[in-house]
Amino acid sequence: MDSNTVSSFQDILLRMSKMQLGSSSEDLNGMITQFESLKLYRDSLGEAVMRMGDLHSLQNRNGKWREQLGQKFEEIRWLIEEVRHRLKTTENSFEQITFMQALQLLFEVEQEIRTFSFQLI
């Protein structure tokens, strides 16, 4: 796993957890939870690719791993739209920078998960 990706996830999660967005704090907590879940999923796929023979193990653990993969891509698309919406509505520069970095990270992670999944197929 790329150490820059790890630190990017940690940095963005830390900064998002410090934000106070008024009535939408529940939505933000949901985004943070999904970011954390996405990071764990990306890490597990990356580890499976590193072991290359782990495809059968992955399939045995989760017989519907392709369906789960599709769900993760849906989550990524939802997060991208949510982050874009936040970017358009916030005027706070700290929040804008955080959401811009989160958006870039989501695009990078989406590409990494696509790469990992093609290697596993």
From Swiss-Prot:
A motif (Nuclear export signal) lies at residues 12-21, 85-94. The keyword Transport applies. Changing K88R: In strain: Isolate MA20b. It comes from the Viruses. Mediates the nuclear export of encapsidated genomic RNAs (ribonucleoproteins, RNPs). Acts as an adapter between viral RNPs complexes and the nuclear export machinery of the cell. Possesses no intrinsic RNA-binding activity, but includes a C-terminal M1-binding domain. This domain is believed to allow recognition of RNPs bound to the protein M1. Interacts with protein M1. May interact with host nucleoporin RAB/HRB and exportin XPO1/CRM1. This is Nuclear export protein. It comes from Influenza A virus (strain A/Hong Kong/1/1968 H3N2). The gene is NS.
